[in-house]
Amino acid sequence: VPIRPGVHYQMGGIKTDVDGRCWDVNGVWKGVEGLFAAGETACVSVHGGNRLGANSLLDTVIFGRRSALGAMDYASKNSHVDFSENDWVNGEKAKFQGLLDNEPTGDLVAKLRMDMAVAMDKGLGVYRTEEGMQEALDAVQGMRERYKKVVVQDKGKAFNTNLIFALELGCMLDCAEAIAIGGIERKESRGAHSRTDFPTRDDENFMKHILLRKGPGGEVTKEYMPIVVTQWQPEERK
């Protein structure tokens, strides 16, 4: 029976507090005020560098409930927001229509998605190096240009799974770029992030989260948030 590594869980995620609020490192809304995240989408920072099996219950059951209660409390204290003429909504509508209007000369969604998967598997698999991760990052950033011309064959606006797959691919490229940038920045091995060019853990320089934020022009900025150590002190595993 052939056996190979596969993706089980994506560590990291949208930074939240314990109540699901998508706050920045200073504990204030940044980006979309009132945005909450829950479950395995969110990163509350409870798992360290490698989440163990079944510990997803902490994300889904405990913090899922806390996020729901937090969102309910926020909604009860804040008035309804009218998005009908919101610039953000209009921008999203234009993005959807732009994908539908693309000429049939670009890549199919499945082709571009496979190219992304191959590049990420090669450069950001189980064992990583600076060179390999940079090659993957360059490839993903090149795919962004190809994505602008990606072909959506179904031009309908109802139950259009081809359009959904195209939109998902855009989000995957965002995540792939973030994974590559974060991996290159973390010049150590920690948890499931294993670098052959930096094989040891570096608590002095990397006991921190690397937070990435995408700006309106597509630029990615980095922030850092220190790890809060309470009862259990970090030690070398022997």
Pin down the residues of each PLM region.
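Glycine- and aromatic-enriched mobile tails/lids
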Residues: 9, 15-37, 41-238
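Active-site Gly/Thr loop motif
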Residues: 1-10
